[in-house]
């Protein structure tokens, strides 16, 4: 909402400069979004009266003017404005004046000396109008500084209101707040009931009292719709961001800005019979003032007469019943429309009006009668005419209630952390017209009709804080005792996991839990994802069941920015439907950790060979995350992963995640460049850690033996090691695969796996006999269990 500081100070005038006033409003919750001068900076411009305006002797389009600026002699000024004429009062820039962008000097124009310049509105920076001189009223004092005459030393405030503070969508509302905050007197213009001179009325029927429980109306006959709007009113409207249209329209807009009550003026001659406030009939249409024809929805409130719909109630009037410059008789409307009946209706038709903006937030339901009296008096003063009685039609049972809200001052003090006495709290609340009664240790506070935001105790506590001043609440650091808590050695935190992955050169990302349906289908084979009822964007319409699609999207975004090496991870929740038969139906949200590596295995540098990251690089990252716990890996078929480069991750025989290279189809479709390698693991599994186990470091020499076994092609090395360990005696410290061989000497469908077996004792040096016996036991057990044979 935009308004003039001068207008505000005509209602309440605190001893504050413009900057301090803006700060006061902001700290009270009425955020000042902008405070700008009403006019550009200029000086040396006064009110001048053109005494003569003759044709320039050397130019057809110029005039030679004699101008009275209150000095002993008339000024000779050459002017090219088409409306320059004798008798006209205009702004006159004297020699030495400083205008926006240039200074005024004495000059010769087509051979004739000119001592100044007559100004248009654009040359003064007041508007874009440059079609002619800015014409001033005949009562403008000659020689007076134009800034003083037009009150240009003004500030235009624009405040950003929260939806609950509709009471401040008017000058009266803002002035009421300033008065309460500064203790200054607040005075609206005196509003007295207009004595009716005629008895003309028009019946009003409230067919929808739930949407409109109060409707005030009045007929004013014999108005002069062509009467000019007073300059003071046009100025206030302009500085509030409202364009002057005609005197009748300007009056309704002015009262809305001043008091906060939207009004509408109908051409009474265009109305038929009684006025009905009702919901639309099937197929009904309304041509609005913005030249838009709408078919009102069933829940849109209408103003209608006996013949047709006239207007969208509380939103916009209709073209067929609107006032024009030929209007003689006016039917004034000032009503209360319930917020629920107006909210969202205008936006559903593709626009928002000043009236709908106010009504959907809440307008004082006691204000319509006062507003119609104020508008009537202004119309009579400006346009003349005779007024009929002000009629009021009310459905009292449907008017909003204002029940008292119980406030406990002790609780307010505890929540706010300030020591405010009960009397101080009462004084603050009564300052904004809240009625307060004492009830023991509590206060019963009744909000006024214009406050729609006071419903519970917390609203009142917030009001106390706001009026006391948020900046007046002392800053106190929170205090609390800290205790050293035991930390289990068998677990670790998500931060530990983050640090481990960061140490492996991964960077953390945080993605939306909403993903594109195609990504969910391609990367998760999820044909029935969990859909959002109201997605924030079409490409974010489903909940993710895996973290991998989000990481893939991060890769694509980085590829488009020429990033050759990408290593990212994320810890977050996924969303899955619970399996049938679970005790509670619905969804589950498991926490997972996932990573993606693409591009170079190592940052490019002269001392290391350049190669692309592969399956085994990321496998080692995952194993490092769980070390010293040993992981198992099994071949995996997954639609998102390469059919020959994917594995399930096992911990203690249980599947906890997956690892693999993205399928070539998706790499090509989503333009990922080189194929990335990804992993995804249950976070709970990554948080488990083995208790530290200490053992003696042997001083004795270790012995190694190499064993080559021929096994079935499909058998994994991990399975062979598992079987070998079953028969290994205590002297065996470890086994590792160091060679795989296919070819000459190996039967088709077979392969040779070579293992290095490490043996050591803590007390003595091992003898060849017991080393050979250990190897023989391992080989024999493997032959029996897996059908392996020792390679000769």
Curated annotation (Swiss-Prot):
FDX-ACB domain span: 698-791
Protein name: Phenylalanine--tRNA ligase beta subunit
GO molecular function list: ATP binding; magnesium ion binding; phenylalanine-tRNA ligase activity; tRNA binding
Subunit structure: Tetramer of two alpha and two beta subunits.
SUPFAM superfamilies tied to this protein: Anticodon-binding domain of PheRS, Class II aaRS and biotin synthetases, Nucleic acid-binding proteins, PheT/TilS domain, Putative DNA-binding domain
Needed cofactors: Mg(2+)
Record GO biological process: phenylalanyl-tRNA aminoacylation
Binding-site positions, Mg(2+): 453, 459, 462-463
Entry's family note: Belongs to the phenylalanyl-tRNA synthetase beta subunit family. Type 1 subfamily.
Residues annotated as domain B5: 400-475
Gene: pheT
């Amino acid at each position: 909402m935009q308004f003039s500081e001068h207008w505000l100070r005509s209602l309440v005038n605190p001893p504050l400069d413009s900057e301090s006033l803006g700060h006061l409003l902001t700290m009270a919750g009425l955020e000042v979004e902008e405070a700008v001068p009403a006019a550009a900076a200029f000086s040396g411009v006064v009110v001048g009266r053109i005494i003569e305006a003759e044709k320039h002797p050397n130019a057809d389009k110029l005039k030679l003017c004699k101008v009275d600026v209150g000095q002993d002699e008339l000024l000779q000024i050459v002017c090219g404005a088409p409306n320059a004429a004798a008798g006209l009062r205009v702004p006159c820039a004297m020699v030495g004046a400083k205008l926006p962008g240039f200074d005024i000097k004495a000059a010769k124009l087509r051979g004739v000396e000119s001592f100044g310049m007559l100004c248009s509105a654009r040359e003064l920076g007041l508007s874009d109008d440059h079609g002619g001189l800015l014409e001033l009223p005949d009562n403008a004092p000659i020689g007076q500084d134009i800034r003083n005459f037009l009150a240009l030393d003004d500030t235009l405030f624009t405040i950003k209101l929260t939806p609950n503070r509709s009471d401040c969508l008017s000058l009266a509302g803002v002035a009421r707040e300033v008065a309460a905050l500064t203790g200054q007197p607040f005075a609206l213009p005196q509003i007295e009931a207009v004595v009716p001179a005629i008895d003309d009325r028009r019946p009003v029927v409230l067919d929808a009292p739930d949407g409109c429980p109060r409707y005030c109306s009045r007929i004013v006959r014999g108005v002069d719709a062509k009467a000019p709007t007073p300059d003071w009113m046009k100025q206030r409207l302009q500085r509030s961001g409202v364009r002057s249209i005609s005197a009748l329209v300007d009056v309704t807009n002015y009262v809305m800005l001043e008091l906060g009550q939207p009004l509408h003026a109908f051409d009474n001659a265009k109305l038929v019979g009684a006025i009905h406030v009702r919901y639309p009939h099937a197929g009904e249409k309304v041509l609005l003032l913005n030249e838009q024809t709408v078919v009102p929805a069933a829940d849109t409130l209408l103003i209608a007469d006996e013949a047709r719909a006239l207007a969208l109630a509380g939103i916009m009037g209709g073209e067929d019943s609107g006032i024009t410059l030929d209007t003689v008789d006016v039917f004034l409307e000032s009503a209360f429309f319930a917020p629920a009946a107006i909210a969202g209706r205008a936006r559903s038709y593709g626009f928002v009006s000043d009236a709908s903006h106010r009504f959907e937030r809440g307008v004082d339901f006691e204000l319509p009668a006062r507003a119609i009296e104020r508008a009537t008096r202004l119309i009579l003063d400006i346009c003349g005419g005779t007024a009929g009685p002000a009629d009021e039609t009310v459905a009292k049972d449907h008017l909003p209630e204002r029940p008292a809200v119980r406030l406990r001052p002790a609780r307010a003090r505890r929540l706010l952390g300030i020591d405010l006495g009960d009397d101080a709290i009462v004084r603050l609340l009564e300052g904004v017209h809240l009625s307060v009664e004492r009830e023991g240790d509590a206060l019963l506070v009744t909000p006024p009709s214009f406050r729609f935001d006071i419903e519970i105790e917390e609203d009142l506590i917030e009001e106390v804080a706001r009026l006391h001043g948020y900046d007046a609440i002392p800053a106190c650091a929170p205090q609390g005792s800290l205790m050293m808590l035991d930390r289990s050695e068998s677990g670790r935190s998500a931060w530990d996991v983050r640090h481990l992955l960061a140490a492996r050169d991964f960077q953390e990302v945080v993605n939306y839990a909403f993903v594109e349906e195609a990504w969910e289908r391609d990367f998760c084979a999820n044909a029935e994802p969990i859909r959002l009822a109201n997605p924030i964007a079409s490409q974010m319409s489903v909940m993710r069941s895996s973290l991998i699609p989000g990481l893939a999207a991060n890769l694509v975004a980085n590829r488009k920015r020429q990033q050759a090496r990408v290593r990212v991870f994320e810890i977050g929740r996924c969303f899955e439907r619970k399996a049938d038969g679970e005790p509670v139906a619905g969804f589950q949200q498991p926490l997972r950790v996932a990573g993606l590596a693409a591009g170079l295995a190592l940052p490019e540098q002269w001392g290391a060979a350049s190669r692309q990251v592969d399956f085994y690089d990321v496998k080692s990252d995952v194993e490092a995350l769980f070390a010293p716990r040993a992981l198992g890996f099994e071949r995996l078929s997954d639609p998102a992963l390469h059919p020959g480069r994917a594995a399930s991750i096992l911990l203690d025989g249980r599947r906890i995640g997956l690892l693999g290279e993205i399928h070539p189809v998706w790499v090509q479709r989503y333009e990922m460049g080189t194929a990335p390698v990804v992993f995804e693991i249950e976070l709970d599994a990554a948080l488990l850690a083995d208790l530290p186990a200490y053992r003696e470091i042997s001083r004795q020499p270790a012995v190694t033996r190499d064993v080559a076994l021929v096994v079935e092609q499909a058998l994994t090395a991990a399975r062979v090691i598992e079987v070998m360990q079953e028969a290994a005696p205590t002297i065996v410290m470890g086994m590792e695969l160091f060679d795989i061989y296919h070819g000459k000497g190996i039967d088709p469908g077979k392969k040779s796996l070579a293992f290095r077996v490490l043996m050591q004792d803590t007390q003595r040096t091992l003898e060849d006999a017991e080393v050979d016996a250990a190897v023989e036991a391992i080989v024999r057990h493997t032959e029996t269990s897996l059908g392996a044979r020792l390679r000769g």
